[in-house]
Amino acid sequence: MSYTIQAQTRTEIGKGSSRRLRHAGKVPAVIYGQGKEPVSIVFEHKDIINIQANEDFYTSVVTIVLDGKEVGVRAQAMQRHVFKPIIEHVDFVYA
């Protein structure tokens, strides 16, 4: 199964801006690997909360539409809230 997430490049980096994004229902994330510069991104929480429940999300290539360009990535790490069903941050690596 293929998964697609719509994302935007983040311009503000840091704890404060990440908290503001989370309160707005968004998930901060980063894409890194393959000798490329890391890219900080943000996407809607509702876009990932349902697809991450599928086991093959963690093993298959996920397509991220980043500012109009498609990027193939794999989920590397995911940080979740301690007791709420909220994803706080995701690390992706280039596929």
From Swiss-Prot:
InterPro entries (UniProt xref): Rbsml_bL25/Gln-tRNA_synth_N, Ribosomal_bL25/Gln-tRNA_synth, Ribosomal_bL25_long, Ribosomal_bL25_short, Ribosomal_L25_dom, Ribosomal_uL5_bac-type
UniProt keyword list: Ribonucleoprotein, Ribosomal protein, RNA-binding, rRNA-binding
GO cellular component, one term: cytosolic large ribosomal subunit
Keyword Ribonucleoprotein included in the entry's annotation: yes
GO MF terms, alphabetically ordered: 5S rRNA binding; structural constituent of ribosome
Disulfide bridge map: none
Pfam families: Ribosomal_L25p (PF01386)
UniProt keyword Translocase, yes or no: no
GO terms classed as biological process: translation
Function: This is one of the proteins that binds to the 5S RNA in the ribosome where it forms part of the central protuberance.
UniProt cross-references to NCBIfam families, sorted A to Z: bL25_bact_ctc (TIGR00731), PRK05943.1 (NF004612)
Family statement: Belongs to the bacterial ribosomal protein bL25 family.
Assembly and interaction partners: Part of the 50S ribosomal subunit; part of the 5S rRNA/L5/L18/L25 subcomplex. Contacts the 5S rRNA. Binds to the 5S rRNA independently of L5 and L18.
This protein's name: Large ribosomal subunit protein bL25
Gene name of the record: rplY
